[in-house]
Amino acid sequence: VGGSSGECIYQHPDERKAVLEAVMSEAKGKITVIAHVACNNTADSVELAAHAEKCGVDAIASIPPIYFHLPNYAIADYWNAMSAAAPNTEFIIYNIPQLAGTALTMPLLNEMLKNPNVIAVKNSSMPTQDIQMFKDAGIQARGADGFAVFNGPDEQFVSGRVMGADGGIGG
């Protein structure tokens, strides 16, 4: 809820909260609900993460901060701040470098795998080989069942599955 298809970047945090509340009133306990909580600043992202946990989502997800190319440690701090605001909720890294301007690197993924709430990557990068690299890193850190990689673009679903994606989160 509230990801790329939901035009999250263009909505005010209050609008995003209202949408999530409406979705949860209908879907909670019936389907898996993942709330995208990224904003252009950490404070709003943290606020949305805490709200999502309060609403009872199954997981939160986030792209990296957009526009400026930040070092890995700054992106990790941004994501970990959101995760800390929702300590009982799983966290999914959303890799979409063609729109976010920053790609998930292996050093950044390995740093994020130190956070036990990080359970998956949604990969929307064009090289489907990234799926295999992310999956291998997750298996190495968490074991075969402890980490998932989801394919993003619908048109790459089959090739993503061939590369090891556990499923897809399309738009």
Residue ranges and their predicted role:
Residues 1-103:
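Active-site beta->alpha loop and helix N-cap motifs at the rims of alpha/beta catalytic domains
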Residues 84-87, 97-171:
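Catalytic alpha/beta core domains of metabolic enzymes, predominantly
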